[in-house]
Swiss-Prot record:
Gene3D superfamilies: Helix-loop-helix DNA-binding domain. This is Heart- and neural crest derivatives-expressed protein 1. GO terms for biological process: angiogenesis; blastocyst development; cardiac left ventricle formation; cardiac right ventricle formation; cardiac septum morphogenesis; cartilage morphogenesis; embryonic heart tube development; embryonic heart tube formation. SMART domains: HLH (SM00353). It comes from Homo sapiens. One of its GO terms (cellular component) is cytoplasm. SUPFAM superfamilies: HLH, helix-loop-helix DNA-binding domain (SSF47459).
Length: 215
C-alpha cells in the first residue's frame, strides 16, 4: 500500500479545500520553454568580460573608440573636428616658434649695447676681450674717476672746470650789443623801466596821450 497515495486520498476526502489561486499562476508552474528563453539573459549577465566579448581585449575600448581617440588626440573634445584641431596645433606651433626669435633679438640688442659701452672706456687695447661683468666693472670705475676729477676741479676754483649752465646770461646778446653801440657813439645809457614810464611815452596814440596830460 502506498502511504503517500493513501494519505493524499484521505486528506482530499475528509478535508476538501478550494484550490489556492497561486497554484494556477503561470510563473510557478509554467512550461519549461520559458526557462529556456530567460536563460540566455542570465548567462550573459553572469559571464565575465573576456567570455562576453571575445573579439575585444579585456578592459580595452572598442576599435571605433580607439580609432576616434587616435584621430582626434588625447585633448580633443567631442564637438571638435580634425580640421579645427589642426588649426589649433598650427597656432600653437607658431607661438612656440616666435619665442626663440624674441630671445635672439634681445640677446643681439644686449650685445650691441655692451659693445658701445666698451668703446667708451679709454686705454683698453683693441684686441682685449672683455666679458659683460668686466665691462660693467670698468665702466663703474671710469665713472667714479670722472666724478673725482670734477670734484677736484670744483674745489680748486679752476674756471675751466665743467659746469652745467642752464640759465642764460642777463640781457642776452642783443642787450650787450646795444650797450656797446651807445658807449661808442657817446649816448647816455638807456633809462631804467621806472624812468621810461615817467618821461617817455607809452604805445598809445598821440591824441589819447594828450587827453591824459590835460586831465
Amino acid at each position: 500500500m502506498n502511504l503517500v497515495g493513501s494519505y493524499a486520498h484521505h486528506h482530499h476526502h475528509h478535508h476538501p479545500h478550494p484550490a489556492h489561486p497561486m497554484l494556477h499562476e503561470p510563473f510557478l508552474f509554467g512550461p519549461a520553454s520559458r526557462c529556456h528563453q530567460e536563460r540566455p539573459y542570465f548567462q550573459s549577465w553572469l559571464l565575465s568580460p573576456a567570455d562576453a566579448a571575445p573579439d575585444f581585449p579585456a578592459g580595452g575600448p572598442p576599435p571605433a573608440a580607439a580609432a576616434a581617440a587616435t584621430a582626434y588626440g588625447p585633448d580633443a573634445r567631442p564637438g571638435q573636428s580634425p580640421g579645427r584641431l589642426e588649426a589649433l596645433g598650427g597656432r600653437l606651433g607658431r607661438r612656440k616658434g616666435s619665442g626663440p626669435k624674441k630671445e635672439r633679438r634681445r640677446t643681439e640688442s644686449i650685445n650691441s649695447a655692451f659693445a658701445e659701452l666698451r668703446e667708451c672706456i679709454p686705454n683698453v687695447p683693441a684686441d682685449t676681450k672683455l666679458s659683460k661683468i668686466k665691462t660693467l666693472r670698468l665702466a663703474t670705475s671710469y665713472i667714479a674717476y670722472l666724478m673725482d676729477v670734477l670734484a677736484k676741479d670744483a674745489q680748486s676754483g679752476d674756471p675751466e672746470a665743467f659746469k652745467a649752465e642752464l640759465k642764460k646770461a642777463d640781457g642776452g646778446r642783443e642787450s650787450k650789443r646795444k650797450r656797446e653801440l651807445q658807449q661808442h657813439e657817446g649816448f647816455p645809457p638807456a633809462l631804467g623801466p621806472v624812468e621810461k614810464r615817467i618821461k617817455g611815452r607809452t604805445g598809445w596814440p598821440q591824441q589819447v596821450w594828450a587827453l591824459e596830460l590835460n586831465q
